[in-house]
């Protein structure tokens, strides 16, 4: 017999919810069942953002730095930045160079005496705001007064000068997209589907009457599925650690 020749298996929202309910010993019956499962999925995605680096959510971005401006807005769905450089001579095959820019804490940034001094940026403070949208009339001071969006920001130091052009090139972790409607597929790779289904089943068992007896096994299955998925979803390049040597003369 021949194999199917296909390798495009995936499940949409309704199918995963149905599978999760079955693991709880229940059936998907009402619109509310669907709605509460979708809510649990979005909470599950938020939990995954706290568990570490999800490789499929890494995206590259670029910000053109302007002379005299040291604070810039990141995309609103940014979780964090994992790498960043300052690029000079962008687009020039001969002169383009990516230079190190060091991440600093708010404490370190606060102690910089002159935050307006200009030069090539060598340090960046990443202000990880919530990304929430507030009514513009009651928006807090740290949100955009026009849009009401409390977007994440970067602040570089020194403030960019006009001696050359600078770009802030970064690699960010973005939020996993929401569950959406019943016909949507998920913003996760196929290898995460078993973990996604196991996690949703566990979350639903916390809410379904009569599913309490299944909680221990569902929690165990979710933990095991997450361990397998997280172990596979990682950077696999070789690493080399070299001790730092400091000399005092």
Listing of model-derived features with the role each one plays in the protein:
Residues 1-249:
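Glycine-enriched, solvent-exposed interface loops adjoining structured elements
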């Amino acid at each position: 017999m021949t194999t199917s020749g296909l390798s495009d298996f995936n499940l949409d929202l309704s199918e995963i919810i149905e599978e999760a309910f079955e693991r709880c010993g229940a059936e998907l019956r009402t619109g509310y069942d669907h709605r509460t499962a979708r809510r649990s999925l979005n909470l599950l995605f938020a939990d995954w953002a706290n568990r570490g680096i999800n490789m499929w959510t890494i995206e590259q971005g670029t910000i053109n730095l302007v002379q005299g401006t040291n604070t810039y807005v990141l995309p609103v769905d940014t979780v964090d930045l994992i790498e960043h450089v300052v690029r000079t001579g962008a687009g020039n095959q001969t002169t383009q160079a990516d230079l190190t820019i060091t991440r600093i804490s708010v404490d370190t940034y606060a102690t910089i005496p002159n935050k307006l001094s200009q030069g090539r940026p060598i340090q960046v403070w990443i202000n990880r705001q919530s990304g929430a949208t507030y009514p513009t009339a009651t928006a807090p001071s740290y949100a955009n007064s026009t849009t009401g969006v409390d977007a994440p920001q970067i602040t570089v130091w020194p403030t960019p000068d006009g001696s050359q052009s600078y770009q802030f090139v970064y690699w960010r972790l973005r939020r996993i997209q929401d569950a959406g409607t019943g016909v949507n597929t998920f913003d996760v790779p196929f290898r995460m589907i078993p973990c996604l289904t196991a996690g949703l089943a566990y979350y639903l068992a916390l809410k379904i009457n009569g599913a309490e007896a299944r909680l221990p096994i569902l929690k165990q299955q979710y933990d095991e599925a997450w361990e397998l998925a997280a172990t596979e979803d990682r950077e696999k390049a070789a690493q080399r650690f070299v001790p730092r040597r400091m000399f005092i003369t």
